Amino acid sequence: IPVTKLGRLVKDMKIKSLEEIYLFSLPIKESEIIDFFLGASLKDEVLKIMPVQKQTRAGQRTRFKAFVAIGDYNGHVGLGVKCSKEVATAIRGAIILAKLSIVPVRRGYWGNKIGKPHTVPCKVTGRCGSVLVRLIPAPRGTGIVSAPVPKKLLMMAGIDDCYTSARGCTATLGNFAKATFDAISKTYSYLTPDLWKETVFT
């Protein structure tokens, strides 16, 4: 039962694909919308579960923070972080949040434009906290040259070849993942030469 107007449009089959939602950059408030479009192909991966503690006068209050990446290995990826008293609820919540945060990934070529686009269209950087992640296009067949954390995210995004470099305290997994996600989501906010408007000389 959809709650938002967007959910109703999806239910009545007014919206054909997720791309239409991204085109008008509408906020997706319901994870069911994502399930509806990508249901079968979605895979999720728990990146990390870490205990976080709050000091109370009776000792510590331990909760679990779960980082979950979700993607369909074909141009959509999301990242969710959820804190909860139990591990299971944290993971479940993180998966829902990851679905809500799913972004389209723009893929391009390295050099000649043959076959399917396989890498990032241009060098992009994303940052979160002190962590800075830079994604650099790579020739076909390179694979993802990266640390384990961004590698999972990039694989889920459906990027086959990519060089990465990371600066800062990449041991903070949350920020490392967020910075990677930030970089991936920036692929569409870049204006690349092939999107330039034709200049009309007057």
UniProtKB/Swiss-Prot annotation:
Q: Which residues are in the S5 DRBM domain?
A: 42-105
Q: Tell me one Pfam family matched here.
A: Ribosomal_S5_C
User: What UniProt keywords are attached to this protein's entry?
Assistant: Cytoplasm, Nucleus, Phosphoprotein, Ribonucleoprotein, Ribosomal protein, Ubl conjugation
List where in the cell it is found: Cytoplasm; Nucleus, Nucleolus
GO molecular function annotations of the record: RNA binding; structural constituent of ribosome
Q: Phosphothreonine occurs at which residues?
A: 192
The answer to whether keyword DNA-binding applies is no
* PTM statement from Swiss-Prot or TrEMBL: Citrullinated by PADI4 in the Arg/Gly-rich region.
Q: Name one GO cellular component term.
A: cytosolic small ribosomal subunit
Known InterPro entries for this protein? Ribosomal_Su5_D2-typ_SF, Ribosomal_uS5, Ribosomal_uS5_C, Ribosomal_uS5_euk/arc, Ribosomal_uS5_N, Ribosomal_uS5_N_CS, Ribsml_uS5_D2-typ_fold_subgr
GO biological process, alphabetically ordered: translation
* Record NCBIfam families: uS5_euk_arch
Query: What is the protein's quaternary organization?
Result: Component of the small ribosomal subunit. Interacts with zinc finger protein ZNF277 (via zinc-finger domains); the interaction is direct; the interaction is extra-ribosomal. Interaction with ZNF277 competes with the binding of RPS2 to protein arginine methyltransferase PRMT3.
What does the function comment of this entry state? Component of the ribosome, a large ribonucleoprotein complex responsible for the synthesis of proteins in the cell. The small ribosomal subunit (SSU) binds messenger RNAs (mRNAs) and translates the encoded message by selecting cognate aminoacyl-transfer RNA (tRNA) molecules. The large subunit (LSU) contains the ribosomal catalytic site termed the peptidyl transferase center (PTC), which catalyzes the formation of peptide bonds, thereby polymerizing the amino acids delivered by tRNAs into a polypeptide chain.
Family statement drawn from the similarity comment of this UniProt entry: Belongs to the universal ribosomal protein uS5 family.
**Identification of the protein by name:** Small ribosomal subunit protein uS5
**Species for this entry:** Cricetulus griseus (Chinese hamster)
Gene name of the record? RPS2
